[in-house]
Amino acid sequence: DPKLMTYLAVETIKNCEVIAVPADGKEHAISYKIASGIVTDMNQKECLALSSPMTKDPNVLNENYQNVSKEIMKKLDEGKDVAYLTLGDPTIYSTYIYIQRIIKESGYEAEIINGIPSFCAVAAKLGDSLADRSEQLHIIPSSYDIEEALELPGNKILMKAASKLSDVKKILRDHELEAQMIENCGMEEERIYQNIDEMPEKAAYYTTLLVKK
């Protein structure tokens, strides 16, 4: 939803000549589509397509971060400001952080414009809090082993759940836990699931679960 973008994010995009997207092209970038809904001159800006591989191999990822950073720095050397678009908040499981570190270490200026984290948007959509009073809250990447994390006290946010949703559902049942889930929160394809039984075996990439004891 473009209206969920912060005023600072919108103003920053408006003031940048180059828009970088983590995709093969702007037509494949959800973040570009969202921003275009509120920044009216997006099509007049130069778009830099910077895709990243879907892998956990650190060597492959680090090589990609270096290559992406070089492409951005080329534009900076031309005297152009670059806005790198990302979904949610760039401090939470975002490719941008790795790129920013390389760019800053190379002597360029780079900053983070905070956004609304996906799990905050999910909780708001569900009409529930993430944590009350003294409750703990844990953010867990469910594409890795989650069983130990589920033993922690308090509520849990399971991110990156799509690729292992079937396994996640089984683990939650084994631990006698209940969960709610939103697929593509804030997008046209949004789907809300109020319990594990409603959840499909596979889901879209942007899928987040809220587990409350």
Put a short name on every predicted segment.
Residues L8, E71, Y144-E148, D167:
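Short acidic active-site motifs
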Residues T91-L152, P200:
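Class I SAM-dependent methyltransferase SAM-binding "motif I" and its flanking Rossmann-like core
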Residues L150-K213:
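A contiguous loop/helix-start segment that scaffolds small-molecule binding in enzyme catalytic cores
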Residues D1-K3, Y7-Y108, Q194-M199, T207-T208, ...:
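Class I S-adenosyl-L-methionine
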Residues E11-T12, L76, Y84, S129-R133, ...:
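Solvent-exposed alpha-helices and their adjacent loops that cap or buttress functional pockets
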Residues K26-H28, T55, P117-C120, M187-E189:
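Short gly/pro/ser/thr-enriched loop/turn and capping motifs at secondary-structure boundaries
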Residues S52-P58, D145-E147, M187-E189:
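A short acidic, often aromatic-flanked loop/helix-cap motif at beta-alpha or helix-coil junctions
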Residues C47-A49, A110, I139, A179-M181:
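Conserved beta-strand scaffold positions in the cores of enzyme catalytic domains, especially
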